[in-house]
């Protein structure tokens, strides 16, 4: 179970699972990346640039590749955009779309980015839904993700309506 804290009215932080690599770097359809377990399985690919349209097509192809068969995998693309900031796009299996935000995908991307680049704790992660901040210790055992929590949808269902 995750621990969480309300920072203020709309900002929260959540303790995330420590990330770990599941294999050596692999090349899938010409994209070299790493399989990271950050509480969910992600294939993380560093890129110099990307578009959401290309990311959607490529991620779907990677997600269904035989390398990750039969279960498939979530796919993340990240690029470094500042001295301690990255941009992340996450394609989530099951939903089969690029997500506005994904906590485990952001952690997986920052974990791999910390190996490849000089980002550190306090890294800012730009996702389609806004900005997140990730704090972690040197061995990635104490990992906290912070950002705005926004209600996107609210619904109710009466059981009687189903009969």
Predicted regions and their residues:
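Conserved phosphate-donor
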Residues: 59-91, 96, 131-136
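Gly/Ser/Thr-rich beta-alpha loop segments that engage phosphate groups in nucleotides
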Residues: 41, 105-107, 149
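Residue-level signal for inorganic ion chemistry
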Residues: 14, 39, 78, 103, ...
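Acidic, low-complexity central loop/insert segments
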Residues: 1-37, 111-138, 142-143, 151, ...
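Pepsin/retropepsin-fold aspartyl endopeptidases
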Residues: 9, 78, 161-163
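Anionic-ligand binding region
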Residues: 21-36, 43-78
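Glycine/serine-rich anion-binding loops at beta->alpha junctions
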Residues: 91-111
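A short Gly-Trp-Pro
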Residues: 65-67, 159-163
């Amino acid at each position: 179970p995750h621990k969480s804290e309300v920072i203020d009215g709309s900002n929260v932080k959540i303790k995330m699972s420590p990330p770990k690599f599941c294999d050596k770097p692999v090349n899938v359809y010409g994209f070299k990346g790493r399989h990271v377990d950050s509480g969910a399985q992600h294939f993380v690919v560093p890129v110099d640039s990307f578009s959401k349209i290309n990311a959607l097509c490529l991620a779907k192809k990677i997600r269904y590749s035989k390398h990750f068969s039969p279960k498939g995998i979530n796919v993340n693309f990240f690029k470094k955009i500042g001295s301690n900031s990255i941009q992340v796009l996450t394609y989530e299996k099951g939903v089969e779309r690029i997500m506005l935000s994904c906590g485990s995908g952001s952690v997986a991307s920052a974990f791999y980015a910390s190996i490849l680049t000089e980002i550190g704790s306090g890294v800012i992660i730009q996702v389609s839904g806004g900005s997140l901040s990730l704090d972690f210790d040197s061995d990635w055992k104490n990992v906290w993700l912070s950002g705005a929590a926004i209600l996107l949808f609210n619904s109710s269902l009466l059981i009687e309506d189903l009969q």
